[in-house]
Amino acid sequence: MQRGDGRNFNQLRPITITPGFQSFAEGSVLIEQGKTRVICSVSMEDRVPQFLRNSGTGWVTAEYSMLPRSTVTRTQRDSSAGKISGRSQEIQRLIGRSLRSCVDMAALGERSFIVDCDVIQADAGTRTASITGSYIALYLAFKKMVDMGILSKMPFTSQVAAVSVSIFKGNIVLDPCYDEDFQAEVDFNLVMNDRGEFVEIQGTAEGKAFSRDTLDQVLKLGEAGIRQLFDIQKGITQPQL
């Protein structure tokens, strides 16, 4: 199947990752996946949420937002609305869960690492790109803390990355762009670690249900895409070792 942008059904969009995109963050990247662009930056604080005080355990959390003209029509800032939108809350919780799944919290001490994901251009897949980019930003932050003697070791227990898969015009397609995502019959977001385990599976039918066989095909295609993302991540993180 040839797609509108010339890709085959099993191809990711072109991906570029720029590490150290922000000078002041403990770790940061700009991830570009097709026309989708997200800045992922990490800040460390010497404190933890109330429920973790005096536990000796750290915390990783995330915030997600979109610039007003990251979208075709202006998206109102959450700050102007006076509250975080339900969509933003859902996405930032997903990002936080995904990152915590691959970190040994005890290795952080009583420190928090806050990951900010700011979408500067949205062409579908912003939440999955945020997860993939945030892993690298967090890796860079942890490496910096180890080099400074603040952390005694790298706290990661695995890699984590994410990708979207859609059923578009009856075809299962990897990493859909906006036009495909907008018209999709079914949308999936898949998060995996490099042990081949699923961290999260989100799947929603838009008017037409899907079969177990279709789900199996989606998972297989998504895993193949995520394996490619792991290799891209390693291209940034391994030179830091």
From Swiss-Prot:
Question: What highest taxon heads this organism's lineage?
Answer: Bacteria
Please tell me whether the keyword rRNA processing is annotated for this protein: yes
Which transformation does this protein catalyse, written as a reaction? Answer: tRNA(n+1) + phosphate = tRNA(n) + a ribonucleoside 5'-diphosphate
- List where this protein forms a coiled coil: none
UniProt EC number = 2.7.7.56
- Which Gene3D superfamilies does its entry note? GHMP Kinase, N-terminal domain
Give the GO molecular function terms. Answer: 3'-5'-RNA exonuclease activity; tRNA binding; tRNA nucleotidyltransferase activity
Q: What class of enzyme is it?
A: transferase
Protein's job: Phosphorolytic 3'-5' exoribonuclease that plays an important role in tRNA 3'-end maturation. Removes nucleotide residues following the 3'-CCA terminus of tRNAs; can also add nucleotides to the ends of RNA molecules by using nucleoside diphosphates as substrates, but this may not be physiologically important. Probably plays a role in initiation of 16S rRNA degradation (leading to ribosome degradation) during starvation.
Record-given protein name: Ribonuclease PH
Q: Which lineage do the record's taxonomy fields give for this organism?
A: Bacteria, Bacillati, Chloroflexota, Dehalococcoidia, Dehalococcoidales
- Give the gene that encodes this protein: rph
